[in-house]
From Swiss-Prot:
Residues 405-871 are annotated as: EPSP synthase. The gene is ARO1. ATP binds at residues 895-902. One of its GO terms (biological process) is amino acid biosynthetic process. The AROM polypeptide catalyzes 5 consecutive enzymatic reactions in prechorismate polyaromatic amino acid biosynthesis. It catalyses: 7-phospho-2-dehydro-3-deoxy-D-arabino-heptonate = 3-dehydroquinate + phosphate; 3-dehydroquinate = 3-dehydroshikimate + H2O; shikimate + NADP(+) = 3-dehydroshikimate + NADPH + H(+); shikimate + ATP = 3-phosphoshikimate + ADP + H(+). Its main location: cytoplasm. It holds the Pfam family EPSP_synthase. This is Pentafunctional AROM polypeptide. 7-phospho-2-dehydro-3-deoxy-D-arabino-heptonate binds at residues 125, 141, 147, 157, 189-192, 258, 272-276, 279, 295, 364. Binds 2 Zn(2+) ions per subunit. Residues 1-392 are annotated as: 3-dehydroquinate synthase.
């Protein structure tokens, strides 16, 4: 058991640390703080903890006579740390008669400690306070040092005081009930204090990390009985005693550091700001990522960034940065904001560079505008005794993954530098394998600290191959080898990132691993690129030798499963080694442990990179095993049985491949660089680079046995290398390429060509490096030629010819392909661009993407380039053009035969303006036009599936980001490889859309279709097998019912077009900004309600599907309901709601599996809104938020029981929870017990305006709250069987009540012009007003005088609400408008007058909307970019028609007219981007290649068509036959109902025709919505206008 410890601070032993010290706690307070009143303050969460209850009871029992104990409980969370809570507590203390001798006891985390401490500092001008911290963060940080504060709306901790507590009583036992994430969160501060002050404690923390995480991850929820209330509570419970000694020490040591620092600098003038290590950057992240990210998590990221800043300055060694990063990860903390789990936790919030810097400028350490950061010198020590000044330039570099390399202009020619690259990756990985297999202790020095070796060390540890520890402040790794005897299978897959070396070496090592009782295999896996890299030759050899290995994904690549109950037999092993020498080294190193001596024969041709094989053999010799090379058989080795004996020390040579970069820097800049620990005795082939490549190019080389010095010639005088075989140093070819790019000679016939061969293996490295170099060099203006096993680089004649990589939109980044060697090579060439320009000339830097990929072999490369070699670097926000946008991500459509894939694929391509490829047709093209059916007959289904998969992977690889729609065969999901490709595409942001329909109808259809290859089995069986696969592979889903009539078909097309536009983000989902409503459906099945759905939705911006009311929750049924609703309501936005029973609905409270499935259906169906209850489990909430795509989330909370008044903290906490989840809309529903509840609600609404808020009260007493709610008020309809909640009103009822309260002023609106006797406008508008309960009146004002309109209406009618303008006033009225919309300006006429207030008016034109919306409503897609348009006539309406067709995206618009002379002035008066072409002769129409699919007739309808105009029209109508949709003509005239143009278009050319009455109604509806702000009841209005 641990001892009670006392830690002095400011000269007093007031910090007490122990375990289970409640007796001591009570005794200390009562004995040393005598008082008449003790006040224990805590939050409601702590009240549930039995240890707290025990403490309170004991405190009461121990009170001396004359003393009393008060308890005050607040709501948990940061929101309680406010002025309001402070005032409430102070009022309570005053009411209770507390005086100056009061002792406040703050029991809780940082919120309680900060707030109660501040109350104590001000109450009665200061009373005593005792801090009893219960969270790890509070124990080691906030309770120590006397800082107290509350938050304000403008920021955290802005109001407070330094008020030292009388005691800080730290009882480790409180941590038993601390939630896992909070526990880990507190470790950030613990690690920080060790990092800045106590190296020994840091080392101790390192060695206990796995114990800590195992215990904390083992926390369980337990039910306990509350000793104070007898209620049953559920709390978290961690077995602290399992790591008591470790926990006690980490708390105590961290407190000691903070106490010592505070004692030296109480008011934070200098030394105390060292405690802010990690906080300058961490706080900036926290400001953006709060409240999703916790303080400690952001400080953890900040510590890594600030440590990298120190390394960038050349102060902190790379090893120390690696140690810090590793320990943070080991304790479960994030080290980058881009970690997948952390991004999901923070809801994928972005952390823009400019915002981070802005947040960093608000830091108490700063001096004015100068930023200060704590700089680490080594683990346990800071640089200086306070924070240091840093520039924004350096911070930008550290905070981003995109680097700007400026020209190497200011580097003196006589510069001489010594650079020591990190340890060799090749030697490091080999040394770790050999030492782990060896016996005894081996101290490995200069080990490369990189991603690769980190994965290798982790694997050796997980497989229990050796005991690993660190010395020399982490610079030396100590491997205690166990001779291979302890190697044991681990349950978790070994993740190796993109570490090719580690993956190859560990594959053979896996063959030596022993099974455990519970584990008979191990799995090796890696990132996406690692899962493409080859490993087959090695696996084939091991399999042939008795090791059982399975591929888990792609044949020939990771992930693999290696069975540990098979044996590594030994004997003769044949291995193909033409792809990678690592296969050879892998078997060589493990061969001594085979059952028999090994003869390893390399077959299939000359092995690649034989020098690396020689390296392995030499290293094996150092560890005690001698390999014999055959004298009779080429490329054959004999390896005896035996055990490695570890040397006591092994020093890793620096990486020769990495050394090529500083040496090439010297060559390119004409300076001198020495690498002091690589010479001609090196084990590594790349050590030849200076001698074999740079020397013949013109450099001076000095090489000893152990060092290499390169002095470059004058800048611009490097010579090309006619030919070099780089097979001994293949990794260095990339460096050679960038040197060759600026090499030239005087021979005019040479083309400055450098030829590099022997590097075929570089195509299967981290990327295809030969292709990568060719692609990226081209961006600099350097030409290359790819060779079968190499590359030719054609150098530029002058360095001045180097270009800044750019395209038509400006500079672009150099892609690094997540490959460290590509990044480092181009960092050199980037600095040469513009390096020879005049010194004062402003130069554009070159942008390098993904700079962090150099972490694989040289994490500190950029630091060396900057601090050692003198390069100027900066960081930058990713370019918009370089970030991956989903706007052009292709769409893959999957589904059963006869699901409508062919038709809907065409619609999809048309709606998005994408290209369409039918994969079955592509298959036939690639197989000599042989049909799929014939191919299957001749070759079988299996062969067809292989070909289908190949083609699919090919098109996705080549065109997945280029805006295509791929229609697939129904069986594409039958192949596991295709399924993986589909899922990979979906996870990369692509759209995989599952199209489905009623299976019964599909079966009937398929059985009658002879054109398709026959199914071998029953269709239903096929569906049952594939259904799960379709769902698994798709990220979107659309239910497409069979259509029996053309109107249904058009409705489905409109529905699909809006759906695809929504899920791809083309159509933005808007949250209404003004008064708006949604209707709540309560049907159990919508199938029989289709006729009523439109009128039910009148006046609403959205419709809510109460899924909990539906008859069943199956995926098909729910999808079908959504489809019915979309078709019936013309895709009014859907709110998808599953209301649980405890929130007032029908859905079972604990059916979380079904609930998840329903939310998945909603998101795949692209619903516009999803209602997410704030009482649901957090993991469900985060899952939905992270998968929401373009769907808006409504965070809802309902109080059906009326438990909470609107001034209760419950609503405040729920609102903050909604902010934490970053929902789009908050919906709160309370219960009005009395009328005053509505007033309290309005106060809440008025003080919570930072998110759209729906807030209403239920019951009839709450009706007024529904009237006063602004955004998306839930309403019912007279056509519904019942309302969804007590007190719901209809839209009309709300509007009438709001009018009676003065909320809506009655307006008078008019149609103006002459003649208007037959105008349908009054009927149109008054019908809408009546249905929606609006108080307005629409009448006629007949006149030919615009002046009279101004006098009588604009100026003379104080209730004027707007005017519909008709002939002859559309032009005359414009002079009286204060503003004109773009439409009115371009069309040149006003048909709508909108009052702006203060006697100001805006002129608009809705004729174009009437035309556009009438066309869309009749099946024309919203985007018709692949189709041309036609306008007939050149009068006033034709301008609106041209405007409408342009808005639809017509790439060309043809116009014909009886009088052709009128065309030219009309065309010239409109914008050139409309691309209008006037047709003067019939002959010119024959030459038009475009399909014409949409037309508008604007000629008088009461006269026959002119013969020539008719001839032109008919020639255009012929061109509609090939449009991507049913060609459609709109007649602008609405009398007569059928015109000559309509007749000829429909009867002779089968065009779909739209009568003018529809245009009339649509333009009127547009006016209605502009004047009233309400969505018009279209169907009712249309029926009223056209019923005559």
């Amino acid at each position: 058991m641990v001892q009670l410890a006392k830690v002095p601070i400011l000269g007093n032993d007031i910090i007490h640390v122990g375990y289970n010290i409640h007796d001591h706690l009570v005794e200390t307070i009562i004995k040393h703080c005598p008082s008449s009143t003790y006040v224990i303050c805590n939050d409601t969460n702590l009240s549930k903890v039995p240890y707290y209850q025990q403490l309170v009871l004991e405190f009461k029992a121990s009170l001396p006579e004359g003393s009393r104990l008060l308890t005050y409980v607040v709501k948990p969370g940061e929101t309680s740390k406010s002025r309001e809570t402070k005032a409430q507590l102070e009022d309570y203390l005053l009411v209770e008669g507390c005086t100056r001798d009061t002792v406040m006891v703050a029991i809780g985390g940082g919120v309680i400690g900060d707030m109660i401490g501040f109350v104590a500092s001000t109450f009665m001008r200061g009373v005593r306070v005792v801090q009893v911290p219960t969270s790890l963060l509070a124990m080691v940080d906030s309770s120590i040092g006397g800082k107290t504060a509350i938050d304000t709306p403008l920021g955290k901790n802005f109001i407070g005081a330094f008020w030292q507590p009388k005691f800080v009583l730290v009882d480790i036992k409180w941590l038993e009930t601390l939630a896992k994430r909070e526990f880990i969160n507190g470790m950030a501060e613990v690690i920080k204090t060790a990092c800045i002050w106590n190296a020994d404690e840091f080392t101790r923390l390192e060695s206990n990390a796995s114990l800590f995480l195992n215990v904390v991850n083992g926390a369980k929820n337990v039910k306990v009985t509350n000793q104070l209330t007898n209620e049953i509570d559920e709390i978290s419970n961690t077995d602290i005693e399992a790591m008591l000694d470790h926990t006690y020490k980490l708390v105590l040591e961290s407190i000691k550091v903070k106490a010592e620092v505070v004692s030296s600098d109480e008011r934070e003038s200098s030394l105390r700001n060292l405690l802010n290590f990690g906080h300058s950057i961490g706080h900036a992240y926290e400001a953006i990522l709060t409240p999703q990210a916790l303080h400690g998590e952001c400080v953890s990221i900040g510590m890594v960034k600030e440590a990298e800043l120190s390394r960038y300055f050349g102060i902190l060694s790379p090893t120390q940065v690696a140690r810090l990063s590793k320990i943070l990860v080991a304790y479960g903390l994030p080290v980058s904001p881009d970690e997948k789990w952390f991004k999901e936790l923070t809801l994928h919030k972005k952390t823009p560079l400019d915002i981070l810097l802005k947040k960093m400028s608000i830091d108490k350490k700063n001096e004015g505008s100068k930023k200060k950061v704590v700089i680490l010198e080594s683990i346990g020590k800071c640089y200086g005794d306070s924070a240091q000044f840093v520039s924004d330039e350096d911070l930008r570099f550290i905070l981003t993954d995109e680097t700007l390399v400026y020209p190497f202009k200011d580097i003196p020619a006589d510069q001489q530098k010594v650079v020591i690259p990190p340890g060799s990756k090749s030697i490091s990985n080999r040394a770790l394998i050999l030492a782990a297999l060896g016996e005894g202790q081996c101290k490995i020095k200069n080990l490369l600290h990189s991603d690769d070796t980190k994965h290798m060390l982790t694997a050796v540890h997980e497989l229990k191959g050796a005991t690993i520890s660190w010395e020399d402040n982490g610079e030396t790794v100590v491997v205690e080898g166990h001779g291979g005897s302890t190697l044991s299978a681990c349950a978790d897959p070994l993740y190796l990132g993109n570490a090719g070396t580690a993956s190859r070496f560990l594959t053979s090592l896996a063959a030596l691993v022993n099974s455990t009782p519970s584990q008979k295999y191990i799995v090796l896996t890696g990132n996406a690129r690692m899962q493409q890299r080859p490993i087959a030759p090695l696996v084939d050899s091991l399999r042939a030798n008795g090791t059982k290995i399975e591929y888990l994904n792609n044949e020939g690549s990771l992930p693999i499963k290696v069975y540990t109950d098979s044996v590594f037999k030994g004997g003769r092993i044949e291995l193909a080694a033409t792809v990678s020498s690592q296969y050879v080294s892998s078997i060589l190193m493990c061969a001594p442990y085979a059952e028999e001596p090994v003869t390893l024969a390399l077959v299939g041709g000359k092995p690649i990179s034989k020098l690396y094989v020689d390296m392995t053999i030499k290293m094996m010799e150092k560890f005690g095993i001698n390999v014999e090379t055959s004298t009779t058989e080429p490329y054959t080795y004999y390896i005896p049985k035996g055990h490695y004996i570890n040397p006591s020390e092994y020093v890793i040579e620096s990486d020769a491949s990495s050394a090529t970069y500083p040496l090439a820097f010297a060559a390119m800049t004409g300076t001198t660089v020495t690498v002091p620990n690589i010479g001609f005795e090196s084990l590594q082939g790349d050590a030849r680079f200076a001698r074999d490549v740079l020397k013949p190019m013109g450099c001076k080389i000095t090489q000893t046995a152990t060092s290499t010095t390169v002095s470059g010639p004058p800048v611009g005088t490097l010579k090309p290398l006619k030919h070099v075989d780089m097979e001994p140093m293949t990794d260095a070819f990339l460096t050679a390429c960038v040197v060759a790019a600026i090499s030239h000679d005087s021979d005019p016939n040479s083309a400055n060509t450098t030829t590099i061969e022997g590097i075929a293996n570089q195509r299967v490295k981290e990327c295809n490096r030969i292709l990568a170099m060719a692609t990226e060099l081209a961006k600099f203006g350097v030409k290359t030629t790819e060779l079968p096993d190499g590359i030719q680089v054609h150098g530029l004649n002058s360095i001045k010819d180097l270009k800044v990589p750019s395209d038509s939109s400006g500079p672009v980044g150099v892609c690094t392909y997540d490959d460290h060697r590509v990044a480092m090579s181009f960092s050199l060439l980037a600095g040469m661009v513009n390096s020879q320009n005049e010194r004062d000339e402003v130069a554009t830097p070159v942008r390098i993407l993904e700079r962090h990929c150099t972490g694989k072999t040289w994490p500190g490369w950029w630091d060396v380039l900057h601090s050692e070699l003198g390069a100027k670097l900066d960081g930058a926000e990713p370019l918009e053009c370089t970030s991956k946008k989903n706007s052009k991500k292709s769409v893959v459509i999957i589904g059963m035969r006869a699901a409508g894939k062919t038709t809907i694929s065409k619609w999809c391509a048309s709606a998005l303006g994408y290209k369409l490829v039918d994969l079955d047709e592509l298959f036939e093209q690639q197989h000599n036009n042989q049909s799929v059916k014939q191919f299957v007959v001749e070759n079988g289904w299996e062969k067809f599936r292989e070909e289908e998969t190949r083609i699919f992977k090919e098109v996705i690889q080549n065109y997945g980001d280029d805006g295509y729609v791929f229609s697939t065969g129904g069986g594409i999901v039958e192949s596991a490889e295709s399924r993986k490709a589909l899922k990979d595409f979906a996870s990369s942001g692509g759209y995989v859309l599952h199209l489905h329909r009623d299976i019964e109808e599909t079966i009937v259809f398929l059985q009658s279709d002879p054109s398709r290859p026959a199914y071998v089995e029953e269709i239903r069986e096929v569906w049952n097998r594939r259904e799960g696969w379709y769902k698994e592979c798709s990220n979107f889903s659309f239910f497409a019912p069979h259509c029996s009539a053309e109107t249904e078909f058009q409705a489905l097309r409109r529905s699909f077009s809006k759906y695809i536009a929504t899920i791809t983000g083309v159509r933005e989902i808007e949250i209404p900004s003004g008064r708006s409503a949604f209707v709540c459906l309560t049907f159990d099945d919508l199938t029989e309600q289709t006729e009523n759905l439109t009128p039910i939705c009148y006046g609403c911006e959205a419709v809510e599907v109460r899924v909990d009311h539906l008859a069943n929750y199956s995926a098909d049924f729910v999808s079908k309901q959504l489809s019915i609703l979309r078709k019936a309501t013309d895709s009014i936005p859907i709110i998808f709601t599953v209301r649980t029973k405890k929130q007032g609905g029908n859905f079972p409270d604990e059916e979380f599996k079904t609930l998840r499935e329903l939310y998945d259906i909603a998101l795949k169906n692209g619903v516009e809104f999803l209602d997410l209850e704030l009482t649901l489990p957090t993991d469900i909430q985060y899952e939905v938020i992270n998968k929401r795509g373009n769907t808006k989330i409504i965070g809802s909370h309902h109080d059906f029981q009326g438990l909470y008044s609107w001034d209760d903290a419950e609503w405040e906490n729920r609102f903050n929870q909604a902010l934490t989840l970053d929902v789009d809309v908050v919906k709160f529903v309370g219960t009005a017990v009395n009328f005053e509840d509505n007033l309290r609600l309005e106060h809440f609404r008025d003080t919570h305006k930072n998110k759209p808020l729906i807030a209403v009260n239920m019951t009839s007493k709450g009706s007024i709250s529904r009237v006063l709610n602004n955004v998306l008020t839930p309403v019912t309809s007279d056509l519904l069987p019942n309302s969804a909640a007590p007190g719901q009103l209809t839209v009309a009822q709300i509007n009438k009540m709001y009018t009676s309260m003065g909320g809506i002023e009655p307006k008078e609106l008019f149609v103006v012009g002459k003649p208007i006797g037959h105008s349908r406008s009054p009927i149109l508008h008054n019908t809408g007003y009546e249905i929606l309960g609006l108080p307005h009146k629409f009448d006629k004002f007949e006149t030919e005088s615009a002046q009279l309109v101004k006098e009588k209406l604009l100026d003379g009618n104080k209730n004027f609400g707007g005017a519909a303008v008709t002939i002859p006033l559309k032009l005359d009225i414009m002079q009286y408008m204060d503003e004109l919309t773009d439409a009115a300006k371009i069309i040149g006429a006003v048909n709508t007058v909108i009052p702006l207030g203060n006697k100001k008016f805006k002129g608009d034109n809705t004729d174009w909307l009437g035309i556009r919306n009438a066309l869309i409503n009749n099946g024309v897609p919203e985007y018709v970019g692949h189709t041309a348009g036609l306008v007939i006539g050149a009068g006033g309406t034709s301008r609106a028609a041209l405007y409408a067709l342009h808005s639809l995206g017509c790439k060309k618009i043809f116009i014909i007219n009886r009088t052709t002379s009128k065309l030219k002035p009309l065309i010239e008066s409109l914008p050139s981007e409309f691309n209008i072409i006037g047709i003067e002769s019939t002959k010119s129409i024959e030459e038009i290649k475009e399909h014409v699919g949409v037309a508008v007739s604007c000629v008088p309808a009461d006269k026959p068509l002119d013969d020539e105009l008719l001839s032109k029209l008919e020639r255009f109508l012929v061109k509609g036959a090939h449009a991507a949709f049913v060609p459609t003509l709109l007649e602008a005239a609405y009398k007569p109902s059928v015109t000559p143009v309509m007749t000829i278009s429909q009867d002779k050319y089968q065009w779909h025709v739209v009568p003018g009455s529809q245009m009339l109604v649509h333009q009127g509806v547009a006016q209605f919505e502009k004047w009233t702000g309400f969505k018009a009841p279209f169907k009712a209005i249309f029926d009223a206008v056209t019923k005559e």
